[in-house]
Amino acid sequence: MEEKVEDDFLDLDAVPETPVFDCVMDIKPEADPTSLTVKSMGLQERRGSNVSLTLDMCTPGCNEEGFGYLVSPREESAHEYLLSASRVLRAEELHEKALDPFLLQAEFFEIPMNFVDPKEYDIPGLVRKNRYKTILPNPHSRVRLTSPDPEDPLSSYINANYIRGYNGEEKVYIATQGPIVSTVVDFWRMVWQERTPIIVMITNIEEMNEKCTEYWPEEQVVHDGVEITVQKVIHTEDYRLRLISLRRGTEERGLKHYWFTSWPDQKTPDRAPPLLHLVREVEEAAQQEGPHCSPIIVHCSAGIGRTGCFIATSICCQQLRREGVVDILKTTCQLRQDRGGMIQTCEQYQFVHHAMSLYEKQLSLQSSE
């Protein structure tokens, strides 16, 4: 069935253009799990001598070229920065900052990426479990699958992290990569294990290259003893909602799968209302689960860029409603503590600011009525 969502978010300002020398995370798929490279366009020219900054933004584990996880002053203080950085914005400050791409860019590059050194994982066969071989789950917060064989660490591995929510609440979300063929069963094992009521998918199946395998059935499939049945598909302008039932033995659960289709290929959206609508829909669905909702799974392709934008927007919307202020910098740092690289580019960081500026204006309009 086709439903139309009323566009009650007034997009008063277009998303400002990001300067062309923005840093772009260039993820290039290969036949097997893939690699990530970073193109730094004009970064050194803009900031002068910044060797440590270049090291932080480089692909982790690329020591052959003299970059990556080499010790630098920036890296030594990265953990402290992620724990302490904060910039509380009131309404007027938020609106001004959202329109200043140079200020946002400078702030973005101060935030350590907190990627994981691949050498931290010594698990044979791990390459088959990762879509991108340099985007790995931070060990302290990673999801561990229940395994019948404790001697086989690969069977408990999935590229996913628990993510804290508003006010540091534990395990509100799970950020994960888009499943590949070899991890579809693992993905559904995680859904069942974590009792997940909601999945948010923010990628197309292909965008020049494959970004995610189609891991849900047309009608019904069984994975690891869990019967997965699509009961209904609802099409809206910006997303598709699948109502799915999960059954194992006599236990049956409901699952809502939101597939956001309005994120354009290779860039960020030029309008914020579609994402704000999705955030609101997911919040309302989570509230229906009661005060102790199990983790919401969010994924794109690598599980850090668009995934980070969605989770940051959701957290910051809650903060604006409850406190009347927002701290996007602190939220980004919290996300990167839990999973490295969350909110992947300057352009995405700017988009989150624009979305929050728009959301604050909408809240102000509602309060004045």
From Swiss-Prot:
Record's subcellular location: Cytoplasm
Transmembrane feature ranges: none
SMART domains documented for this protein: PTPc (SM00194), PTPc_motif (SM00404)
EC class: hydrolase
Major localisation: cytoplasm
Phosphoserine: residues bearing it: S49, S72
GO cellular component entries: axon; cell junction; cytosol; neuronal cell body; perikaryon; plasma membrane; proximal dendrite; synaptic membrane
Annotated protein name in UniProt: Tyrosine-protein phosphatase non-receptor type 5
Organism listed in the record: Rattus norvegicus (Rat)
